[in-house]
A protein has these predicted regions:
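Long, intrinsically disordered, low-complexity segments
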Residues: 18-21, 103-106, 191, 216-219, ...
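Membrane-proximal, proline-rich intrinsically disordered regions
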Residues: 19-68, 90-94, 255, 338, ...
Length: 576
């Protein structure tokens, strides 16, 4: 009943709110606003509605994930919309994202809430036993909403660069006249907003004691202080990166942005560690169906699906298994990134390296947790036969949807989910938005760029980048060698990028990391696949390079033509 009441309150009020994707504005119906203001539950429902706009990527492009527009993977079916990112069909008319629409709608809802629903007293409920707890939760909503608004602005700037900006409900005269605010100014605003609310928002929902309203679970998916600091830290990293940092490398302005990024990531890490957070032992538990409990030591913020499903598994479990489509297939390019456990180097750094050999033995343990390969057993765990990804095999080409790369995706798939018609099962999925592992890497990158080498320290930053980057490698059940001493800057930077690709694979980072580094032509102009052939009991391998289109205009998305038609003040991104 409570859930229905929340949803009803949400639908009642937002049926009359502005449609932000069109930047249009309509006044609230006063009766409906007043109706929602009567109860804690209905006002809370408005905030819950905004949380539902958080982004995830369990196959946003008809099963394809954004990773398949990068060198992480290739979608196994031709003609999917994901190909638009690299086949020349991308354009303002074919803008390939709902981010503009969804973010501006969410921002409008945030502005509406902050202007219309703060400062309430709920005096009719003063005599209930948990009035104090309900008011404590209610008074926190405004800080959650301010975080969410800043979060949506970050997503917009990351994708479009300069964007229209408003922190209030638009008047009729303001509609469709907004100009684009410089990206760096929006980043500055996000960081300032995070600083203003970080000590006001609830620090930790698991330590509320008597301030937990009756009937409520202490565990929530809501923003807390660490979430706010995570947004600040990631924003500072992006603001300092080449795509947004217009200062000459090595200049004072350049270093100031990297200093801010290092300081912000250090602040988050120290806050997390002070709260007892750490890297969990089992890498794969980060995306387990119960990650919200068994990975809570590392997870800072995530977006949990509202119900148990099996659609992601149907899209990505190997072709040849019942009701499975193959989907997003990891590339040989990604496989190459997993280093050898003995020595901590990529196979292609070996003196006797042969590009047509896969070097599966002795690899970084994260490889087998992320990627399914030929001969793997119990993938998924109800499959009783070894995978056959060689040409003509049971899970391979020429079957429709057979892996074009030689591999299948494991990460984010729940291995226990059964997709058969006779025994179908479902389970929970949580999209990782922020986790501690990312910020150790962010901090290492910022330190390296600010201090100039991976081994430098000072009084404020006593731990060098080289030690910080090794933390994800030293996870108990990963236990890869630390980064070595004595690497020059070029080699260290390449090794750092490789570590980031491996640790954060398929978590939605690669698409944006390569863009903020302005290295699109280097990484996204081709991918490698591995064609496998069987003869008797032996296998042979042939590396295949698949070319893709890259143009530097792709560092930012095009502004949708439909939005430009509504607002003549919107300028288009360069090249589009």
């Amino acid at each position: 009943m409570k859930l229905n009441k929340l949803i009803y309150g949400v639908l009642t009020i937002f049926a009359f709110s502005s449609c932000a994707d069109q930047m249009e504005y309509s006044e609230y119906n006063p009766y409906d606003a007043g109706y929602v203001k009567r109860t804690f539950y209905d006002v809370g429902g408005l905030v819950s509605n905004i949380y539902q706009s958080l982004d995830s990527d369990f196959g946003n492009y008809s099963g394809a994930i954004l990773g398949s527009a990068t060198d992480e993977s290739q979608y196994s079916y031709t003609g999917n919309a994901i190909e638009t990112f690299y086949n020349g069909a991308w354009s303002p008319v074919n803008a390939q994202s709902s981010m503009w629409t969804s973010c501006y709608k969410a921002i409008a809802n945030c502005n509406n809430y902050l202007e219309e629903f703060t400062g309430l007293t709920f005096s009719e409920y003063e005599q209930i036993s948990d009035y104090e707890a309900e008011m404590y939760r209610y008074n926190n909503y405004q800080y959650e909403v301010r975080f969410l608004r800043a979060y949506f602005y970050f997503n917009l700037v990351r994708q479009y660069g300069d964007v229209p900006f408003t922190d209030h409900v638009l008047s009729t005269s303001e509609v469709n006249t907004l100009t684009r605010k410089p990206a760096q100014e929006v980043f500055d605003w996000i960081i300032k907003e995070c600083d203003e609310i970080k000590d006001l928002i609830i620090p930790d929902y698991n330590n509320l004691g008597a301030l937990v309203p009756s009937g409520e679970s202490a565990e929530t998916g809501r923003a807390n202080k660490r979430t706010v600091l995570a947004l600040k830290a990631r924003t500072a990293l992006y603001a300092a990166s080449p795509l947004f940092n217009s200062h000459q490398e090595g200049s004072q302005g350049y270093k100031e942005l990297w200093y801010r990024a290092a300081k912000a990531n250090k602040e988050l890490i120290e806050t997390c560690e002070d709260a007892g957070m750490r890297l969990i032992d089992d890498y794969e538990n980060l995306w387990d169906a119960k990650s919200y409990s068994i990975a809570i030591d590392e997870l800072i913020f995530g977006c949990r699906a509202i119900r148990a499903t099996n659609s992601f598994e149907k899209y990505n479990f190997p072709v040849g298994l019942e009701n499975c489509r193959g989907g997003n297939c990891p590339t040989q390019t990604l496989v190459d990134a997993y280093e050898l456990k003995d020595g901590g180097e990529r196979p292609d750094k070996k003196a006797d390296y042969d590009k047509n050999k896969p070097y599966y033995e002795g690899r970084d343990p994260r490889f087998e947790k992320t990627i399914a390969k030929n001969g793997d057993t119990k993938w998924p765990n109800w499959n009783e036969t070894a995978l056959e990804t060689y040409q003509g095999g049971a899970n391979a080409e020429p079957l429709s949807g057979g892996t074009p790369t030689g591999y299948y995706l494991k990460k984010y798939c729940q291995t226990s989910i059964n997709t058969t018609t006779a025994k179908p099962t479902t389970d929970n999925h949580t999209w990782i938005i922020y986790r501690l592992g990312e910020f150790y890497l962010n901090y290492a990158e910022a330190l390296f760029k600010y201090l100039g080498t991976a081994y430098a320290t000072n009084n404020e930053f006593p731990i060098p980048a080289n030690e910080m980057v090794s933390k994800t490698r030293r996870r108990t059940k990963v236990n890869m060698p630390k980064f070595p001493a004595g690497l020059d800057n070029k080699l260290w930077w390449e090794k750092y990028q490789n570590e980031r690709m491996v640790e954060l694979a398929f978590e939605g980072h690669r698409f944006w990391d390569v863009r903020r580094w302005k290295e699109g032509d280097k990484h996204f102009s081709s991918i490698d696949a591995m064609k496998i052939y069987k003869s008797g009991d032996s296998y042979s391998y042939r590396r295949v390079t698949v070319n893709r289109q890259w143009d530097d205009k792709m560092y930012f998305f095009p502004i949708p033509q439909s939005e430009k038609a509504k607002n003549p003040n919107l300028t288009q991104n360069p090249g589009w």
